[in-house]
Amino acid sequence: RPLAADGRPCSAFLTGGVGTGKTVTAKRFCADLARYCQQHNRLLDVIFVNCRIRNTEYGVILEILRYFDRGFPDRGFATDEMLDSLKKHLELNRRPAVIVLDEVDNLLRNNSRNLVYQLSRFSEDLPNPSTLSLIMISQFSVAEMLDEASMSTFKRANAVRFNRYTEDELLQIINARAAEALEPDTLLPPEAAMIAKQAAEYGDARFAIEILERAASVAETEPEGNICPDDIRTAGSSVYSDVSEAKLDDLDDNRRLALLAIARAIKD
């Protein structure tokens, strides 16, 4: 509300496992916020950075700068110079900006806490309405990865935890995607429920959608054209939910030992 109403900077943490809707929620929120600002005769810049790809301070700042200047060179500047350039762009634009750092844990593991601290304090040196808000997305609690100085700037940040999807929620997602992407009656209720049940083990919407997509591709090659249980089994055998540290943490000791034995056997 402070950002939408008068451009005051805000911060937010979005945490949760793979496929729980963190990134799509952030994108939808930013799109709705930009639309709201436009309806009230204000503009808003939204910059998304995938920190799995851009996992260094230099790479993140470069990605942000190229939002404002697509021709900004990828070498020849120190990070401090690049931050000064970013500040000038924000001052010239005279409108608030939101930076979304997706999978920020990849950045923080590379000892880039200082960049997060600097971005979080940017607005202190910017005249209104040139403010900078920060949204950080991670599978893990970002608070545990920040130093004390950085964390002090996020004391009032909004924290949202995304839990795994339930089977019923996955079923709703599958039906919604099928309604948009497939011909009517291509996916019938029993088959939709079968996909939801298969994906519910992980609570991963991305996994469920990939099974639906693969099953639909298999069904296209068949005379009937409808998704059947065999199509789903075929699709499920070729799609795997992303492995993450958060998922490994959920394994009991016996499963961890079994996984370790398999990994060592493959390595040898």
Where do the protein language model's features map onto the residues?
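Walker A/P-loop nucleotide-binding motif
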Residues: 7-28
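Pre-Walker A adenine-sensing motif
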Residues: 1-5
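Mid-core helix/loop region of P-loop NTP-binding domains shared across ATPases and GTPases
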Residues: 6-9, 45, 53-63, 67-157, ...
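Winged-helix-like regulatory helical subdomains adjacent to P-loop NTPase cores
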Residues: 229-268
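Conserved phosphate-handling catalytic cores of large alpha/beta enzymes
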Residues: 178
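N-terminal low-complexity, intrinsically disordered segments
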Residues: 31-33, 126
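Conserved catalytic segments around the Walker B and adjacent sensor/switch elements
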Residues: 12-13, 36-52
